[in-house]
Structures are given as structure tokens and as C-alpha cells.
Swiss-Prot record:
E.C. no: 2.4.2.60
Organism for this UniProt entry: Eremothecium gossypii (strain ATCC 10895 / CBS 109.51 / FGSC 9923 / NRRL Y-1056)
High-level lineage: Eukaryota, Fungi, Dikarya, Ascomycota, Saccharomycotina
Compartment list: Cytoplasm; Nucleus
Protein name: Thiamine thiazole synthase
Sequence positions bearing 2,3-didehydroalanine (Cys): C210
Amino acid sequence: MQNEHSEFAKMSQTLTNVQELRLRASTTRHALSDIVREKDWSDFQFAPIREATVSRAMTTRYFEDLYRYAVSDVVIVGAGSSGLSAAYVLAKNRPDLRIAIIEANVAPGGGAWLGGQLFSAMIMRKPTHLFLDELEIPYEDEGDYVVVKHAALFTSTVLSKVLQFPNVKLFNATAVEDLVTKPSANGGVTIAGVVTNWTLVTMAHDVQSCMDPNVIELEGYKDDGTRDPKKKHGVVLSTTGHDGPFGAFCAKRLAALDAQHAIKGMQSLDMNTAEAGVVKESGATAGVEYMYFAGMETATKKGVSRMGPTFGAMAVSGIKAAEEILRHFAE
């Protein structure tokens, strides 16, 4: 009998809640409530505009960005979870740095829009939850790990925060085709920038000839192209992942330039060794000045195991690489 009363009470409360929601719906308020007649949108109009105005508004701003970021302090190649995490830490701590993010896809975020096997939830092992706390992303605490209800919640949140920084520009649908290099005084390679093109052009080089690229130069050079010792040299952080047409691109390009930077290849799945390994191996590259790696590109380059559908190392490796880059600019 007691259980029946309990169930009846729950049903009554549910019905009451539904009635309240219906009552609220009858007087719904939204952003346009003051300019739209209730239940009648027949007189709704947008402000007038000329087609050329739209074109000029887009064009001028994009080319202003191209001009401003033609010389950048930090170029991040790949806007996946590690690249975006690094961008957040860098932009937050150094608002004076010009940070260009180059993403080959139209949609940034890499593989972090879904969890494993196209499922929704994102699993992150502790202590990555501290980064989620900073970003104010809710999660379920399961002891040693946390669960974000949908991977897209993490990606959209960090992406939104990164894009709001005034010193960050995302160039999506843009591919890095090559690296700009110069001889190093110590006999290695100095990274001086990246070579860019529209992604669709890059992928069409086999069907059309003579489609030359553009460049983004790293800060640190005079107008004649020689090194300016008065300026802090910029850096490239490559976070291009391991899959797709541009996976591990910068690691592969370095290997092609110099055999000592040969790719070891990503090893089979082992979550416990993989995540710690990716974080430990992320950061600066020996023998290559001003070049940093993070995320799954690190696993491919250094021969670390893959971790599969657990994302803590993606964020943390980006944070670690960002910390090293911040030290570089602080020296």
C-alpha cells in the first residue's frame, strides 16, 4: 500500500510539473518577443542589406586576418582536442601572442565530436577533470575517470572559448602543405613557418598543375629575411592526429627532410601506457628548432601505443606542449 501511495505521489508531481510547463509555454519569452506579435510572425522582417555589402564584410575581414597573421608567434597545425587545448592555455596566458590555427577540415574539432565507435560519451581519466572544471564543462564522476555526456560538449566549449580570444585566428578549410625551413646554426633544422593552401586545392594537385601556395612566417626575422636577434622566434605546434589525408603531416614531412627524424609508427592499443606516453613525448623536438608536437601525432612520431576512446591525453598533451611554448617565450 505504501508503495502505491509513493507511486501515486510521483505521478501527481509529474502531472503538476507538466501543467506548469504548459502554462509557461503559453507566455513564452524569447529574444525576439518584443518585436514579434504573439503567435503571428506574418509581419516579421530582417534589416535590409545589399548583396555586395555581405561580400565586402567577409572579404575585408578575412584579408585583414591574412595580413595580420602572415607573421605569427605561434602556428598550431590541426584544431583537434590537443591543438585547441594548447591554444586555450597559450591565449589565456599570453594575450600578446599572435596565434594562428590551421585546420584542413571545414569543421574544427578533429575526432573529438564523438567518443569511441561513433558513440556519444567522452571518457577522460583523472586528473584531466581539472581542465574540465576550468572550462566549466559538467561531467559524471566515476572515481578514476569522468564522463562528459557528449564529446561535442567538450569540443564545442573549448572551441568557443578559444575563438573568443582576440589574439587567435582559426583558418579552417586550409591545409599545411609544407614547412618553411632555414639552416640552423647547430647543424639541425630551423622551422621558420608553414606553407598553406585551400584544402580543396591541396587535394587536387594531382588533377591540376601550378596551384602555388601561400605562407605564414614565424616571428623573428627582418624585412630582408635574415634573423632578427631582437625578436623572440615563433614556434609551430603540430597536432594533426594520425588518421586522414593530413594525419601526422608535419612528422612525415620532417622524416622526408632528414632521416634522423624517421617516424617510429604508432603501436597497438594499451590505454595505461599510451596516455602517459603521449603526454611525456609531447613538446619540443630534438634537432628541430621551434617545432613542437602533441596529441596522436606524437604517438605516430615516437612509436607510442594508441589509447583508443579515452581522451585525457589529448587535452593534457596539448596543455603540456603549451606550457613548454610559454617557457620558450618567457626566456
